Each structure stands twice: as C-alpha cells, then as structure tokens.
Amino acid sequence: MQIFVKTLTGKTITLDVEASDTIENVKAKIQDKEGIPPDQQRLIFAGKQLEDGRTLSDYNIQKESTLHLVLRLRGGGMEPTIAALAKKYNCEKKVCRDCYARLPPKATNCRKRKCGHSNSLRLKKKPKE
C-alpha cells in the first residue's frame, strides 16, 4: 500500500509499505529517500507520536494515509569541562555588601560610586548542588 509523509517544509514523500511494517521500517525508508537518520525522526499520525516497535496496523494507518514528519530537537547539556569553567567563572567573585555589585576575586574596594567605593566586600555564595 502507499502512504504519504509530509515534512515541516511542506514536502510530501510517497512510500510503499505493508500494514505489517514497523515504524522503524518506515523510518528506514524515509532515510533511504531523504537521508534523515531514523534517530532524528518523529512520526505523528492522528495527533499521536508513533513508537518504533509498533506496526502501521496498530495505529490503524491505511492506504493513502498521511503521516507528519518532525525532526528531533538538537542540543542539551554542556560539556562537563565547559560547565566546570562556567561555574568557576561565575562563583569565584566578590560582592559589595552595600550595593551588591559583582567584583573580581582580587578586588579590595567596590568600583561603584553609589556606595562610595566601599571596602566592605564578601565572597559570592556558592550555589547549592
């Protein structure tokens, strides 16, 4: 049977499949046609995201049905070394007790005029982990 896969760009892909094909197989066919890796594909039918292990018949997908292809969002956490560097840079500072200005770790007086360049400084508190 023939089904259609519509991408977010509006392009429609035609696939020849069987009702017994798994969603993984459909994603592999999309990869063959479009070059999009299956791990980045999300298929939506009738408002539901299709799971890899299930078949087309499980979702009542019949001939000439249209699936919607959405790509997985990239990104995530920072590399541990970058996270440690950011933590060090943001936490090892001094704070003026009068105007709460953030100052470099070796500062002895505040740089702001509104507190009269106070020498009342404290270390910035460490965030809770």
From Swiss-Prot:
SUPFAM superfamilies: Ubiquitin-like (SSF54236), Zn-binding ribosomal proteins (SSF57829). GO terms for molecular function: structural constituent of ribosome. Keywords: Cytoplasm, Isopeptide bond, Nucleus, Ribonucleoprotein, Ribosomal protein, Ubl conjugation. Pfam families: Ribosomal_L40e, ubiquitin. Transmembrane segments: none annotated. One of its GO terms (cellular component) is ribonucleoprotein complex. Residues 1-76 form the Ubiquitin-like domain. GO terms for biological process: translation. The keyword Ribosomal protein applies. There is a cross-link at K48 (Glycyl lysine isopeptide (Lys-Gly) (interchain with G-Cter in ubiquitin)). There is a cross-link at G76 (Glycyl lysine isopeptide (Gly-Lys) (interchain with K-? in acceptor proteins)). SMART domains: Ribosomal_L40e, UBQ. It comes from the Eukaryota. The keyword Ubl conjugation applies. Ubiquitin is generally synthesized as a polyubiquitin precursor. Some ubiquitin genes contain a single copy of ubiquitin fused to a ribosomal protein. In the N-terminal section; belongs to the ubiquitin family. This is Ubiquitin-ribosomal protein eL40 fusion protein. It comes from Tetrahymena thermophila (strain SB210). The gene is RPL40.
